Amino acid sequence: MTVLLSSINGFAKIKPTNEVAQNASQLTTIFDNYFSIKDALISSDAGTAATNAKSMAIAIKAVDMGKLSTEEHNVWMKVAKDLGGSAEAISKSKDVSKQREAFNLLSKNMYELAKASKQAVPVYYQYCPMFNNGKGANWLSKESAIKNPYYGNKMLTCGSVTETIK
């Protein structure tokens, strides 16, 4: 926020800058793409997951790091390459099981980004203990109810909320 002082009336006026809005929209697009991929994997829809992942890969390349907060920028520098690689892997695969494997790494990096960025609504970090040969896997959701993207209808409600990010 920028504080502007008016010499006319002596009152301070607080005016939000466009940079804050641009920053939010950059990351909002990436989060929206992520949630769309998750929803497609819940439905075991490899085609829609691939399409949404392609959109996400484009949005990742378009991020202007100079408009991110310091914390977001630091996290972005660590996760951007893997985010792009995971999104590309999902977009190029027609096999939902391979997409789910790539989604696991995508989710780890999106978690780091979610922790660093300010979300307009709570985001739930959820966990499935069964995926990855019993090693487990996490994902982000806008809903607290479990809808497992790693198994879809086979084990739709397998998992739990491990953290709420506000």
PLM feature segments, named:
Residues 1-16:
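Bacterial Sec-dependent N-terminal signal peptides
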Residues 19-166:
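Mature extracytoplasmic or organellar-lumen-exposed domains after removal of signal/transit peptides
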